[in-house]
Structures are given as C-alpha cells and as structure tokens.
Amino acid sequence: MTVKGKIWPPIRIFAFFVVLLSMSPCIILARNYMMRVSLLDKQGCGYSLQMPEAFLSQRAIERRIRQHLQLDSTDLPLSKLYLDKIAARGVRIVSQSKWNNSVLVFGDSLALLKSLADLSFVRNIELVYIEPDSLKEFECPRRTVAFPELDGTDDATALQLHQIHLDQLHQAGFRGKGMMVAVLDGGFQYADHIPALKRINKIGERDFVFPPSHNIYREHSHGMKVLSVMAVNEKNLFEGSAPEAEYWLLRCEQTQTESRSEEDFWAAAAEFADSVGVDVINSSLGYSEYDDDEQKYPYRQLDGHSMMISRMASMLAQKGIVLVCSAGNSGDDSWKKITIPADAEDVLTVGAVTSDGINTVFSSVGPTADGRVKPDVMALGGYCSVINADGEIAQQNGTSFASPLIAGAVACLWQALPDKTACELIELVRQSGDRYQWPDNIYGYGIPDFAKILEKEKYVNGNK
C-alpha cells in the first residue's frame, strides 16, 4: 500500500501567495525542489573499513561476522569534504545515502541546484521533487476520550498465524525474542497511546522525511496498523507475528505527495536500520507512479536495479538483513504489476490471499521485467486482523498487512535458526511454499509453511 504524506509549506502559506498573485500579475509563486546528487567516490570521508565501530553499531558488526559478510566501500559514510563543498553552494542537504553514494539537496532555485553538476566530484544529478502548487496539511483526528483496552472472546489473529503455520513456532517458544525489526512506513498514528501498542517492545523511532514531522505518532495510521500485525502481544485476544521482537519505527514516506525523493528517504531509513543492527525490515510501501508524469517509470525498469529504491533493497541481504515488502495493491487496476521496491533481488515480496488461500483481486502480480518470479510468497491480506486508529480490532485488506505477517515469521524462524544467513532464510521460506514446484506470477511460490521449515532443519542437523 502506498500512503501519502505531509509536506512543507502548509496550505495557509500558499493561500497567502495566491492572494498576492491575484493582486499583481508580476509576482511568481515560489516553488521548492529536491535534487539527487550522485558522487564519484568517497575521498576524504574520514573513516576506515578497519575501524567499523566508528560508523556501525556493535550489533551490526556482529551480524555481519555471524554471516561471514565483508565490509566494503558502500558501508563507509559519505565524504565530508564533498558535503561541505555542496553545502557551501547555498543548498540544504536533507538526506544522504552511503550505499548509493548520493545526497538529496533542497532549494528554491532550480538553477542553483543544477549548478551542482559543475562540481568535479559529482557524477550526475537528478531532479526528484517539484513542489506542487497547493497542498492540504495532514490533520490527525483529535481524541477526546481514552483509547480502550482490547475486548473479545476469540483470538483475532489465530487464523492468519495458522495459515502460515507460525502458531506452531510460537508454541515451541519462538516468538521473536532477541530479534530486532524495523518498520518503514508513513506514520504511526496514536501508537504511543493505544494500550496494546504502548506495551510492545519498542526501541525507538526516527523520521527520515523532509521536512520531518513534529510527531510521527500524529501522522498517518497505516504504519500503526502494520506494526500491530507484528508486535502486539495480548494473550488470547491479539497475538502479532513476532510479539517478543524489538521494534524500530522509521518514517520514510510523505503522506500527500508522491515523488522520487521518497526513494531517498526510504534508503536513508534502511541504512539507519542496518547501522543499528536490525535483523528484519518490513516495508509495506510501494511506488508505481508519481505526481510528476515525467518521473513515472515504465515496466521495463522493474528489474531490481533501474530504480534507486530497488537497488538499495537488493543490497540488504548482502548486509545480513532480510527485507520483507508488500507486493502492492494494483492487481485490479491498469498497472496490475508489483510496485517498487518489490522487484528487488534477494527480498521476500508478499502478495495477499483470503482465508481460503485464494489470491485477492487487488494483489499485484509479477513477473519482474527480467523474468524473476514475483511475488515470492503469499499471506493473509484479505480481512487480516489489525488494530485500527480507534484502538480496536478490525479486519482490513491489503498486501500491506500480509507483509508483516511474513516479516514477523522470519524473525521467529531466525530466532530458531540463528546460524542461517539472510539469503539462506529467504530461500528456505520460498522452498516451503505450497506452490514451490510450480510457481506462477500470481501466487509466486505460494503460502509458506514455517513449521515445515523448522522441522526439516532440525532433522537435517540431527536434532529431532
């Protein structure tokens, strides 16, 4: 699911400019831009691969060691020398990507932004954001009464856990303990007030959008619902897919515009997740078109590498992280195909099925432009149980909710099989699908069986 986000300036400022325009035809409406500036190298970055503790947490370093992964130049921060020279031009650096070796700069002079191409260390520039003529500021619904505690007599999540046989892992004691999960989304509305979400194992939160929100808990509710599918731990009422895991809440999606700048925000969030030692990322965000028609991409670029966000997603497994992402909800519209970064390599792209195991009409389909099977696997996304913005149990549709089911399941499986690498886990999940022998572009490898994976691995290793 793609959600839309808040942006600066708010509408009252635009209204003021519109009045001035009506008074004087000579006044030109101010407009802001963002430019992605790719750099040639990292000379003068001031860091060394021999001292990774200067730019990675100990947990991130240990994750690489455990999976026998080598550090490389993409792990190094950007050149401070280059950053200083860019800032000296009078533009504002609002985001950085060390993996892409690029920065996102903001300014109100397109000519000034374009002049950055003249710098000797700049590889290329790309205009990724043009401010719209007018926008409404996102308004979070006001609450006048306290949120309720969950109520009911049935376990609302029993079906969605059982469909992928995750309930058996939970019963065996594998509930995500010791695993760290990052949720990349557009907002986590009232996750700080809803009782069931206040009790989750949250480590922290960050906002990577420019301009940042005053409070990510007063932004869109989409991320809160996604989080609930994984993290809530209310016995016999609502059990998330990884209720004992620890969670980072990372906002990287604007809520009212769609532009390629959001790829930069996503990359910054993913790199932060890597640096703090996250094991699994859930991204229930996807892009198939942007507000500016010139920024839209054709199907032939759905190859895992043409778009920045997909390139960064394809790198995560090589950093020791499993990325689980939603396939998209375009199955019943003209696009139909998966959305980026679901086209990435070495990730688990998740489509949506009903409780009967039938694909939902909205679930996006594959293949990728280079012929790879997508989606990878399926989970419940038709009437999936979530906690809604009123703090109550509800059933909602979307691959956005199928994805966190699989992300949490991967965290639980990794807890059970700590010696596996990210790439090995991804392949094990695919192989457990009920259509692994005959994959297609609707179901991918089918509905995975996490109990089957664990049983097989224990027997293979001689531990019944």
Residue ranges and their predicted role:
Residues 1-33:
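Bacterial Sec-dependent N-terminal signal peptides
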Residues 39-41, 107-108, 128, 183-187, ...:
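Active-site-proximal beta-strand/loop segments in catalytic clefts of secreted hydrolases
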Residues 194-205, 352-401, 437:
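Catalytic-core environment of secreted peptidases
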Residues 233-236, 249-343, 369-372, 389-403, ...:
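Substrate-binding/access-modulating region of protease and related hydrolase catalytic domains
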Residues 168-206, 212-262, 276-279, 292, ...:
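Subtilisin-like serine protease catalytic core
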Residues 227-230, 250-254, 337, 381-443, ...:
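Hydrolase catalytic cores
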Residues 31-140:
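Inhibitory N-terminal propeptides of secreted protease zymogens
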Residues 93-97, 112-113, 137-183, 206-220, ...:
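N-terminal domain-start motif of subtilase-like serine proteases
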